[in-house]
Amino acid sequence: MKIKQIASLLLFVISLCLPLSAKDIFVSLSTGKNKNAGTKEAPYKNLWKAIAVAKDNDVIHIAEGIYPGRMKCGWFKLIKPVSLIGGYSADFAQRDPLKFKTMFQPRNEHNDKKAGAQGILHIELDRSPMKAPKGFHMVIDGIIFDDGFASSYHATKGKPAGFDTGMWLEGPAMNKAADKFPSANRYSIHTAAASRGDGNLTIRNCTFVNGSNYAVNVNWYKGKVAILNNVFCNNRMLSVNVACSNGSGKINWECANNTILFTWSRLNDLADMGFAVRNNENCNANIHNNIIGLNVLTGFDNTKGNPKRKTTKLDNNIFFLNRESDVQMTISPSIAKVKVDGFEDLEGTDGIESIEGNVDLKDPSIFKGRINAKYLNAFLSMKYSEKTKLDPGKCNALRSVLGLPLQGTITTKCDMYANRYPWAEALNLFGAVKDYGAQLPK
């Protein structure tokens, strides 16, 4: 009898440790009501409502629409491991993230409400390793993040012909005639460094455009992180940053089939930051099959942290027209800045385990009709106090296929800086090159 009681108690304890089966919750801004049951037939209206009622491992399916956050605050906070899947038609009969656009697009007039989160999507699980969730897999899929209408831009300075805005302004500077508040200056997706949890995170089929700070800033405690099949266009400082917040552990992460263009420097002097991807200490990175181009400083930055405490596989990527270099790393006592044709010298250096199959862009015509031509021309023409650092021959090759005027030498003075990019045109970057960069979402 005693053995049976002990066995029953053990089964009960085990049942408490097992995750409950995931529930599907549905949200439709145009057809839902917050008093509904949150089913496909009776969806909630607001995403914040679905997040509030969701339990660990639930999946929230989000129909097309621009979701403003509670009281139009412009952000959402996840304190439980919940998945967000966007790109559905209003009746959930179809899913196509490029056709049925699920958007997080905050507005400047609500920047006074931004203090509740450091990102448009802020993930912060329990801070106690004992209480934090385990064994989960969070997925963020098919959402468009655009912080361009929460930012403030100069009325005239750094405004090339045909542009909607001048250069991006960092607070407290602002365009007082057009905006109520300074730029939000926040991450698009942020996971808090104090967050704990043992599980996996996947970010896929998303678009990150006009980010006012890092696009993806992941601090992960335990588990795996995957950044797959996303478009990053016109973000500040860093597009993809994954770090380990567990001082005694390591995480594995993958960055694959992303298209990463126009990552801007920290300030408008173009002096520092402006990286597409960075690997950090206590991280093992597998970076492959991406398109990495037109970034202000470098494509891949490997200068952060002790190189003996991280590893990187950097294989089969397309690099093109990154302003200073394609890879930047520490080769003591200096910083090495290397173009793709010099990658063979880097294997075994600075934690690089593999660096094979990377190529320079051979056919610039693949971007015809996909990159905004005015934006590209202004970017290629940038010149500050120093001579341009871009290869004029490669610049003209790209100009030629886009029908832009060629330049014998690049002398045009243009002090543009993170001007707002037409967000809808960023979606054209999906499917540009078979097997490389972001493919059409499935």
Annotate each language-model stretch with its function.
Residues 8-17:
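Bacterial N-terminal signal peptides
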Residues 20-49, 66:
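Right-handed parallel beta-helix/beta-solenoid
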Residues 82-178:
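Right-handed parallel beta-helix/beta-spiral solenoid domain characteristic of secreted/periplasmic
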Residues 86, 135-149, 164-178, 198-210, ...:
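Right-handed parallel beta-helix
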Residues 93-103, 107-109, 172, 179, ...:
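Acidic, glycine- and Ser/Thr-rich low-complexity intrinsically disordered tracts
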